[in-house]
């Protein structure tokens, strides 16, 4: 089970599937917690915005044609921080084994000016290797080899100024009530509250089954 067994499911759908099993529901809840935390962290390090405007057609690094359409997510190059190398796109902390975070697209206008867009590679609905899920996550290899590549500087890299807004964003991330344990939950909670609820739910189920076992054995 994974976060897809919770995300977007109605109470009935959940209760007829993963919700019927303590093991499956716990797996799904844990994966949802990881999914939400990982995507929230990556979105702070590598913020996206929706592209607004007419369609743009450019080329990718391998020479393929790529069209950027309205509503696609692209890197917010105006507001993102960078690592010690000062390069765009900045490195995400957690990566999917099946795809990079961005596709680099170079678009040349009628005047011959070229602009680079970093188009976010959305999570696949069917290919697990392209999802931020426990079975296909890893710490970014680039950051493992060079930890200073974690985004932490403003793009005015000559001054090596620390991007203070990142600290504020991470503080706010922990405070937000944006996640529900499962479709049966009546309210949203913070990550810490979610974890406490998940452990409490599993502990309660374990206690019930233990009592049933003891009763049957007596």
Q: What is the role of each PLM region?
A:
Residues 1-218:
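Structural signature of extracellular appendage/secretion-system components
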């Amino acid at each position: 089970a994974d976060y897809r067994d919770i995300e977007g499911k109605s109470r009935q759908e959940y209760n007829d599937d993963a919700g019927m099993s303590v093991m499956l529901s716990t797996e799904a809840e844990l994966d949802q917690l990881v999914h939400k935390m990982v995507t929230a962290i990556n979105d702070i390090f590598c913020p996206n915005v929706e592209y607004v405007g007419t369609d743009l057609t450019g080329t990718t690094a391998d020479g393929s044609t790529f069209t950027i359409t309205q509503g696609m997510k692209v890197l917010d190059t105006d507001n993102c921080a960078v690592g010690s190398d000062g390069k765009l796109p900045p490195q995400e902390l957690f990566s999917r084994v099946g795809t990079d975070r961005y596709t680099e697209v170079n678009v040349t206008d009628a005047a011959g000016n070229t602009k680079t867009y970093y188009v976010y590679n959305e999570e696949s609905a069917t290919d697990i290797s392209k999802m931020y899920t426990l079975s296909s996550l890893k710490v970014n290899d680039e950051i493992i080899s060079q930890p200073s590549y974690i985004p932490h500087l403003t793009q005015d890299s000559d001054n090596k100024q620390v991007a203070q807004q990142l600290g504020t964003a991470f503080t706010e991330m922990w405070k937000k009530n944006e996640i529900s344990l499962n479709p049966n939950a009546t309210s949203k909670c913070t990550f810490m509250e979610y974890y406490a609820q998940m452990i409490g739910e599993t502990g309660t189920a374990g206690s019930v089954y233990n009592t049933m076992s003891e009763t049957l054995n007596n």
